[in-house]
Amino acid sequence: MKKIISKRNIVFITAATVAGVATSLFTGYTERDNFNMPYSQIPFCAVSPKLPGEITFAGEKILLTAQDRRERLDREILAFTYSHINTLLQLKRANRLFPIVEPILKECGIPDDFKYLMIIESNGDIYAKSTVGACGLWQFMDNTARSYGLEVGKHVDERYHIEKATRAACAYLKESYDEFGDWLTVAATYNAGRAGISKRIEKQKEQKAIDLQLVPETSRYIFRLLAAKTIFSNPVNFGFTIKNRDLYPPLPIAKTLTISTDVPCWADIAKKHGLTFMQLREANPWIRETEMPNKTGKRYEVLIPDSAGLHYNPEETVAHNACWVVK
């Protein structure tokens, strides 16, 4: 016999189902699932982090009481705070990269805070490549890279060479400081170019880029840099609970190999040292192909990781900056 459900019953069933879903969404689970996952009776809550009244960048105190400054910083702080994956990866990668980059900045006379410029340029991704072709941690375009002495080609691309690209970035930043005399303005030139910033300073009769009306990308860039420093100075204040074991340790480099001949197969060199080609390239991201012709006899310094050291105990990882982690 065919059963017919009345409209009244359909309405009742639908209402009960909706009520059940709503209860599930807003009160959380009342029982643990089969995987014994923890549960919460409190729904997700987004909060707006407290902003500082001032920030010191490259030794200069920057007041944030003005409406435009405060609200521009607020936007970037929120972007970092709620872009959980990117910000966590930036912090994890920084533990590996900052010990390499910081001494170079110091040696070249560039303020330590410019390591955060590297972070906002590439998220600390050694293989980063933008849609317009800027590459590496410091996001050099090919012609700019060549003008600062970096080799850019099919087999070798030194925009991905951490030390050399950092030195090239320092050279650019130093030249910009010689012209503008203000480090935050120098940072703006890294995004918009010296000519563009100089023209706007002249037309708007200001002295510093932070007070300029700029295209949205560059305007945000300045405050993204300040936000990066703010977040990295105390991640836990912005909801990032990280332990030592979560950070990426520096690569264990066993030795440096000098090569001035053709390399028919990088994998052969890797295997000779107990490595995979991928592991060799992780330490030398400037290697772009599985082989390297070298007609000029140029000398290349190749970092050889300790194959045993690549297998590590996360619990033994040491934080480069103690303020990044919680006990």
Model-inferred region functions:
Residues T65-Y248, R288-P293:
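Catalytic glycan-binding domains that act on GlcNAc-containing polysaccharides
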Residues K2-G109:
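An acidic, Gly/Ser/Thr/Pro-rich helix-cap/linker signature
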Residues Q279-V325:
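Extracellular LysM carbohydrate-binding repeats and other cell-envelope/extracellular binding modules
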Residues T230, K271-G274, M278, P285-R288:
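Hydrophobic alpha-helix feature that most strongly marks membrane-spanning transmembrane helices
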